[in-house]
Amino acid sequence: MAWIWISLLLPILIYFPGCFSESEEERLLNHIFVERGYRKELRPVEHTGETVNVSLALTLSNLISLKEADETLTTNVWVELAWYDKRLAWDMETYNNIDILRVPPDMVWQPQLILENNNNGVFEVAYYSNVLISSDGFMYWLPPAIFQTSCSINVNYFPFDWQNCSLKFSSLTYNAKEINLQLRQDLDEASQRYYPVEWIIIDPEGFTENGEWEIVHIPAKKNIDRSLSPESTKYQDITFYLIIERKPLFYIINILAPCVLIALMANLVFYLPADSGEKMTLAISVLLAQSVFLLLISQRLPETSFAIPLISKYLMFIMVLVTIVVVSCVIVLNLHFRTPSTHAISERMKEIFLNKLPRILHMSQPAEPEPEPWSGVLLRRSSSVGYIVKAEEYYSVKSRSELMFEKQSERHGLTSRATPARVNPLNANNSQDQLYGEIKPAIDGANFIVKHIRDKNDYNEEKDNWYRIARTVDRLCLFLVTPVMIIGTLWIFLGGAYNLPPSLPFPGDPFIYTKEHRRLI
């Protein structure tokens, strides 16, 4: 019979051991939460007027991103909370020297701290880890969280900027008379004195560095608004500050360098000849390229009217300058294609644009042709003009018969007279008038040809002068635009390069909020 009872009780002993025995932790939990009648809705104080001290610390694991367009800072942190709840204390000897209990956070009282300046509607932590309870009633809670906080972006010096973001914690349930928010205090082993942890804790082994932002200052501070009553929930808060500086290399390579190179291409417009027809095409192409970059920058930054980013100032400066280049191209092309039949060049204009400015701008000038031996004839004329003049002189001293048979005599080998025939002056004058009347149509035709050639040369010379004026204006614009572009570029970007973060976290406060400069209590 005994073995029958054993076979019946053995499965029960295996599968239901709790029916016959209870662990020390279970007895302790039952004693604290059931027998004592623990109520998590009540503050852990013996008297109503007492204040619960809640210490807070923040450990930064990763600065994930800062989205300028949304003005949102995303961080991965560990929120460290600690307080005392004497209702949960116990005698370690009674419970087999158990010194720590781990319970879910919804079983105990919490100070209900929230992130005030969140930007996504999530006020609490992401994961509710267990709360550690010590035998003396000390409560320690270290939940992880990924916070998205609102961060006001100062775009003045983008991309050579620095930002001051913060994580502000407060309790919207309890006022300053009910809970006292304070920074965590650690013990200085050398002096055996406590000091507040007035900075964000960064574990070098667990911290992941951000590729765009560099952390400069990480102070932590308790803020008290003296203008409010301690009974207000906004009277006190603990704020952790992140002063970060942008690493501009990404923007220099991908935005600034292309912008500067494309802007310098605007100077090539002045080297293109006007006859090529590509001056306007190149200038407008540069203008459109800068417009595309300005559009890309506007999508990256917040829509604000309080400040203009540094890169936007530069792009606007270049766009205005390229617009001036386009206008100068229009003027140069207008001057280049002018003709004497539509426009006349004044003497003052010739003096300025053909003599003075070319010498100042060190422009090469065409060599002046040497004048011909006779006056009254155009410098650039046909050689036939000289023959006509010589013919008139020749006919005036030769008799008509000599003129008729001179060529035949030369053809048959006869020599002509060395001296001209002497004729009666009266007969000579009559003969000359008769000869002039016969050759007058030929002389008129020759004069017409000379006049036509002279007019054509004058026309071409005037047109060449317009070409030279257009070239002078083109060179003048080059000498004006290039220095303005270089000086403006250096002035804008050097102003951003000297925009350094502050040497101290708070203006007027000489304290450096680091562990090396901790303040002992």
Curated annotation (Swiss-Prot):
Residues 336-475 are cytoplasmic. Pfam families: Neur_chan_LBD, Neur_chan_memb. Disulfide bonds join C151-C165. It catalyses: K(+)(in) = K(+)(out); Na(+)(in) = Na(+)(out). Glycans are attached at N53, N164. The keyword Glycoprotein applies. The modification Phosphotyrosine is found at Y394. Keywords: Cell membrane, Disulfide bond, Glycoprotein, Ion channel, Ion transport, Ligand-gated ion channel, Membrane, Phosphoprotein, Postsynaptic cell membrane, Receptor, Signal, Synapse, Transmembrane, Transmembrane helix, Transport. Its main location: membrane. Residues 1-21 form the signal peptide. It comes from the Eukaryota. SUPFAM superfamilies: Neurotransmitter-gated ion-channel transmembrane pore, Nicotinic receptor ligand binding domain-like. Residues 22-247 are extracellular. GO terms for cellular component: acetylcholine-gated channel complex; neuron projection; plasma membrane; postsynaptic membrane; synapse. The chain crosses the membrane at residues 248-272, 280-297, 314-335, 476-494. It is found in: Postsynaptic cell membrane; Cell membrane. GO terms for biological process: acetylcholine receptor signaling pathway; chemical synaptic transmission; membrane depolarization; monoatomic ion transmembrane transport. After binding acetylcholine, the AChR responds by an extensive change in conformation that affects all subunits and leads to opening of an ion-conducting channel across the plasma membrane. Pentamer of two alpha chains, and one each of the beta, delta, and gamma (in immature muscle) or epsilon (in mature muscle) chains. Belongs to the ligand-gated ion channel (TC 1.A.9) family. Acetylcholine receptor (TC 1.A.9.1) subfamily. This is Acetylcholine receptor subunit delta. It comes from Xenopus laevis (African clawed frog). The gene is chrnd.
